[in-house]
Structures are given as C-alpha cells and as structure tokens.
Amino acid sequence: MAADRAQNLQDTFLNHVRKTKTPLTIFLVNGVKLQGIVTWFDNFCLLLRRDGHSQLVYKHAISTIMPGAPIQLFEGGEDASA
C-alpha cells in the first residue's frame, strides 16, 4: 500500500508540473544539474525540454527534483497525508 501511495504521489507531482509547465531543476545521482520542463513521463523515464531541445532522463538516475515555483498538489492543511 505504501508503494502504491508513493507511486501515486510521484505521478501526481509529475503530471501537475507537466500540465502547468512548471520549470524544474533536476539533480542526478552523479551530481549533474538539469533544468527544463517535463513534457512527458512514464514509469521509467521522463522527457525534459529546454531551449527547444529534449532530453530523455531515466528516473533511476534522478536524485532530486526542485520546482521553480511553489506547487499545491492536495487541498487541505499542513498534513494532507493523514
């Protein structure tokens, strides 16, 4: 059940930033910093676009994703996971 929730949170987050075209900074596990907008994703990878160029990024290589602007995924107060 926890794995299902984590997957749903990941999909919800990625779908939100894709639909709103929120600029992201993505850090890979090797320290490389990527920036761009998510245009597509699946269970294993995402497509990141910047300056008219697209990069296919494998999710297993991603360490951290930081949105360029605050996002609100769920309605409610401070602890929406309860």
Curated annotation (Swiss-Prot):
Residues 11-71 form the Sm domain. One of its GO terms (biological process) is regulation of RNA stability. Pfam families: Hfq. SUPFAM superfamilies: Sm-like ribonucleoproteins. InterPro entries: Hfq, LSM_dom_sf, Sm. It comes from the Bacteria. GO terms for cellular component: cytosol. Transmembrane segments: none annotated. GO terms for molecular function: RNA binding. Keywords: RNA-binding, Stress response. Homohexamer. HAMAP family: Hfq. RNA chaperone that binds small regulatory RNA (sRNAs) and mRNAs to facilitate mRNA translational regulation in response to envelope stress, environmental stress and changes in metabolite concentrations. Also binds with high specificity to tRNAs. Belongs to the Hfq family. PANTHER family: RNA-BINDING PROTEIN HFQ. This is RNA-binding protein Hfq. It comes from Bradyrhizobium sp. (strain ORS 278).
